[in-house]
Amino acid sequence: MNAPALRLVPDASPHSTRSTATSEDPALRPVSFDDYIGQTEVIANLRQSVRAAKRGGWQLDHMLFAGPAGVGKTSLAGVIAAELGGKLHVTSAPAIEHKGQLATLLATLGEGDVLFIDELHAFKREISEVLYLAMEDRVIDMPAGKRVIRIQLPKFTLLGATTHAGKLPKPLLDRFGFVWQLRLYTLDEMTTIVSRSAGKLGMPMDAEGATTIARASRGTPRIANRLLRRVRDYTGGADVQGGLVPVHLVIGEGIAQAALAQLGIDHRGLDSLDRRYLALVADRPVGIEAICAELAEDRSTIEDAIEPWLMQAGLIKRGGKGRLATEAGRGHLAEVG
């Protein structure tokens, strides 16, 4: 039997700010509810539930976090585990290829552990069914030759994350005690996150510089932290007007804008692919399949990575005939050329 696809630190090395994999410096992640910025109502409810579970001596209910990629679902799982004092195990549904892998993973859990499964919607139905008994009765059935052995699991909390809650089987969805919807962040929240992360990265930055990067971060902390690292690269090696930018220079609006421009990112966080999308739908409604063909991108990239921010920013709208740029979207195209 293959070893379970399990890791304690969810990390990857994406090649662009559009990747859905996490690449953040662990030092940038919040470590407590007090340290977590944004998602105020969700945090208030979670704080209350965790406090009650600790005081009452019961295990925290299983929870599902739904929302766009990069808005803090993995970070929130880490905070919950830390607040509970339990060990966090992290995996993703695409990494689990058959039922035996998931059963083996569940069998490794200890009393009070927290299991975080990302991209829960990607489970094959027969694999997700293994979770039903585990979540409801804390048991799993393990094959042993021609027999099946039922194994009792310790008390644990499953935290699931998805960008497509509607794709989850209803029996799985119904087994979560809470379903929380995480949203994109406001400009004020993003500015606070950028300022805090810049401090942790040792990057002197003024308020205007933080706001400039926050505006380009598409309401997503993960993107903000990646952009910060690229700005750090820029200040450490860019040639500006015949000389290098001093590494310890305070990063203001001008340097932030120059670094973003070098990356091809405009002041609203749009890159060349976003602008190509916007130009494609500027004059008439276009269906999703035609957009995918024209941009040579798969549907999940269009729907998960491009459209959420364009809609949040009021640059496009979706209707029965397809996607169409708004007046603001056409204005943005005219502004950036």
Map each language-model feature to its residues.
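Pre-Walker A (pre-P-loop) alpha-helix and adjacent loop at the N terminus of AAA/AAA+ ATPase modules
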Residues: 23-68, 103, 208, 213
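Conserved C-terminal helix/linker of AAA+ ATPases
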Residues: 234-264, 274, 325-328
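Conserved AAA+ ATPase core "coupling" helix
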Residues: 167-201, 207-215, 226
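Walker A/P-loop
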Residues: 51-93, 104-111, 132, 163
